[in-house]
A protein has these predicted regions:
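C-terminal outer-membrane/trafficking sorting elements
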Residues: 629-674
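Short, compositionally stereotyped local motifs that mark structural "simplifiers"
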Residues: 429-515
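Surface-exposed, short loops/turns at beta-strand junctions within beta-sandwich domains
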Residues: 482-490, 573-578, 658-660
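Substrate-binding cleft of carbohydrate-active enzyme catalytic domains
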Residues: 95-131, 135-137
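Aromatic- and acidic-residue-enriched carbohydrate-binding clefts of CAZyme catalytic domains
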Residues: 29-31, 72-104, 134-184
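Active-site-proximal helices and loops of the catalytic beta/alpha 8
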Residues: 23-39, 49-58, 68-70, 75-82, ...
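Short proline/glycine-enriched turn/loop motifs at strand-loop junctions of beta-rich domains
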Residues: 403-404, 453-460, 529-533, 577, ...
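Aromatic-rich carbohydrate-binding modules that target alpha-glucans
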Residues: 469-480, 527-575, 588-597
Length: 674
């Protein structure tokens, strides 16, 4: 008996240790990932902005890939792909505290955060100086001997010889990254630091998984080693290459990481008829019938992270047009979201077509499609392409093309979605109700189309809008009927078949028109010697310039708060996603601040004496100087202009005296509207 117990506990310990190792990407995974940023998306990817979207993502998005969250050596806005600090998580997208709050909010909504891990290369102060960082009482620092000996086409070695320092004896294992030091992953010191860093991201910050940047630069064996050390569940590598090379890399990791399915993306792009920001041909949707991708292969589709566009392909500017889709974005997403692999939706697509993409995701999940589902082709013509994917709950047919009416499935399918160049059909075996408008917030009343997906042709739909479960006695409509949603409500719609209600679907709608409001941005330059009395504000957002052209608008309005002089300017927030980017300056070719994201609420900035690349940095002191979020400590205000505005307790400036009851700030005092 004692021997049997020892064997039993040994087996338990062995299984526990096995479970600690990384699995690369879960099998039969039904989740959908969102790339939570695009290039220079400082407006929309602030941690505070993303946190406000968590409730809206719930039930649709399961993973969000965040931009690199570590602090860089630059103090201006940067995307983070030249990392400097590992354990300092204050970035252009927000503070570490805001990041932790975001990840906690995601987790509360069933969403995991994927860290952008950039460890192929690292930035330095000068040529060779890496920061010394202390975490949990241990100091971590890379040295010059952790740099690959042939870094930057051996220009680093030339500089090392001049400076009398040594590099690693090992060459780079892959593609070189110019402008940063390529790290030697064979170095024990490098391995120790990166493992500590990844454990910090996962166990302390709270990330669920990792997206490894530029994995062509170092061996996949290291990714396997790092993932084993952290026991991470989700890992995806950016191996931008031909399909077989991506497969080889996955094998090199011992299948302990997934990879982005670049060739899936190119199949979609080619079918649409675009390349390098040019329309090169008419669409030929039959080109989607390709086996040159990870998604088609039953052995590797578990590790396929499919996508149709990302930050390295989107249109950035006329000088960096890159390789965007340009057209048929909805059809591309419809195809991706109906196929196996784990789809990764691009943030600009999500923002532009959220309602449609939500419905696509809902259909995918209703059918039970996973990253390992099987599919068959139903039609492959120039103007029409159709695939049938078998989920673990039902089957879903996606039809895309310029003539989607060319394919109609049999009577065992019901059409549930239709849009520009795409259609979705769900097998009637699903036996469910369906609504074509997903849960979410809407700015105006709308009509919702209800569909009975049932093998019983006489099935009806019953629904309620008060959140109660529908019964046979509830409001009843025929399949294909439209109902009006004219206020915030919870719609529950069920399938009424042979007197029984089944297949109930729930939709939570918030109907609320956006009300434009005004924020104020304040600037104080007392710390900067000889700044003078001239102050220009230059502001912009994705909609364009919010002030006069550079150097902006000359600001003469000031307020004195507790003896401190503040220049200020009001900005109208016209949509829920709008923000304000701002630079303070003295005029053309004179002193100026770094650029800052002021968000969409009142902000106070002190221009400091510290500089970055010749530009003055600013300290956000809103918490000290803003109209109070509490009721105490209201500052004494002396205006050079009359301020008769009304403010909410969060500092939001209103256009007029509020009609809604509540507590407000008016002329520096708390006022209660009853």
């Amino acid at each position: 008996m004692i021997i049997m117990k020892k064997i039993y506990f040994t087996l338990i310990a062995l299984l526990a240790s096995i479970n600690m190792f990384a699995q690369g990407w879960p099998a039969n995974y039904s989740g959908v990932m969102l790339q939570g940023f695009s290039w220079d998306s400082y407006d929309y990817s602030q941690w505070t902005v993303l946190e406000k979207q968590a409730d809206d993502m719930k039930g649709f998005i399961d993973l969000v890939w965040l931009p690199q969250s570590g602090k860089c050596i630059e103090t201006t806005q940067v995307m983070g792909y030249k990392p400097y600090y590992y354990f300092n998580q204050n970035s252009s997208f927000g503070t570490e505290a805001e990041l932790r709050s975001l990840i906690a909010k995601f987790k509360a909504n069933g969403i995991g955060a994927i860290a952008d891990v950039v460890v192929n290369h690292r930035n330095t102060d000068g040529w060779f100086t890496f920061p010394a960082e202390t975490y949990n009482g241990v100091t971590y620092q890379m040295s010059s001997t952790d740099i690959c000996k042939n870094d930057d086409n051996e220009s680093t070695a030339t500089q090392a010889k001049k400076d009398g320092v040594s590099l690693s004896n090992n060459s780079d294992e892959g593609t070189d990254f110019g402008g940063c030091r390529d790290i030697d992953h064979k170095s024990e010191n490098v391995q120790k630091i990166i493992k500590a860093y990844l454990k910090f991201l996962k166990e302390d910050i709270g990330y669920t998984g990792f997206r490894y940047d530029m994995v062509k630069g170092f061996s996949g064996t290291h990714v396997a080693d790092y993932n084993d050390a952290t026991g991470v569940e989700f890992s995806v590598g950016e191996y931008w290459d031909v399909n077989q090379s991506i497969i080889n890399w996955i094998n090199k990791t011992n299948k302990k990481s997934a990879a982005f399915d670049f060739q899936f993306r190119y199949n979609v792009r080619d079918a649409i008829g675009v390349k390098d920001n040019n329309i090169v041909s008419s669409p030929n949707w039959s080109k989607l019938k390709r086996d040159y991708n990870l998604m088609h292969d039953p052995t590797y589709r578990q590790y396929a992270i499919t996508f149709v566009e990302n930050h390295d392909m989107q249109y950035r500017s006329k000088d960096e047009p890159l390789d965007p889709l340009k057209r048929d974005t909805l059809a591309a997403n419809a195809y991706m979201l109906a196929m196996p692999g784990t789809p990764c939706v691009f943030q600009p697509h999500w923002r532009a077509y959220k309602q449609e993409i939500k419905s696509m995701i809902e259909a995918r999940k209703l059918a039970g499609i996973t990253n390992m589902s099987n599919y068959t082709n139903k039609m492959a013509q120039t103007a029409c392409f159709a695939n049938e994917t078998t989920g673990n709950k039902a089957k879903l047919i996606v039809v895309v093309g310029n003539n989607t009416k060319a394919y109609t499935p049999g009577t065992d399918y019901a059409q549930i979605l239709e849009g520009y160049h795409y259609r979705y059909y769900l097998s009637k075996s699903a036996e469910t109700a369906w609504c074509n408008i997903p849960s979410g917030e809407y700015e105006a009343v709308f009509k919702a189309k209800l569909t009975a997906v049932s093998q019983n042709s006489n099935a009806k739909l019953v629904y309620t809008t008060d959140g109660t479960a529908p019964t046979a006695k509830s409001k009843q409509v025929a399949t294909g009927s439209n109902i009006n949603i004219d206020e915030t409500c919870t719609l529950k719609v069920g399938l009424l078949s042979n007197g029984t209600v089944t297949g109930i679907r729930t939709y939570n709608y918030t109907v609320k028109a956006f009300e434009p409001y005004t924020i104020t941005v304040y600037a104080n330059a007392d710390q900067v010697t000889n700044w003078g009395s001239v102050m220009y504000f230059y502001a912009w957002n994705t909609s364009g310039e919010l002030t006069e052209k550079w150097p902006g608008t000359a600001v003469t309005a000031t307020k004195t708060l507790n003896g401190k002089k503040w220049y200020y300017m009001d900005f109208k927030i016209k949509s829920k996603d709008a923000i304000v980017n701002i630079i303070f300056n003295q005029g053309k070719d004179k002193k100026q601040s770094v650029d800052m994201n002021a968000g969409n609420s009142t902000k106070f900035y002190e221009i400091t004496t510290a500089q970055s690349n010749g530009k003055y940095t600013c300290k956000d002191v809103t918490a000290t100087w803003a109209p109070p979020t509490g009721i105490t400590g209201t500052p004494t205000i002396s205006n050079t202009t009359t301020d008769n505005a009304w403010y909410t307790l969060s500092g939001m400036k209103l256009g007029k005296k509020p009609a809604k009851s509540g507590v407000y700030i008016h002329q520096g005092k708390k006022v209660i509207i009853r």
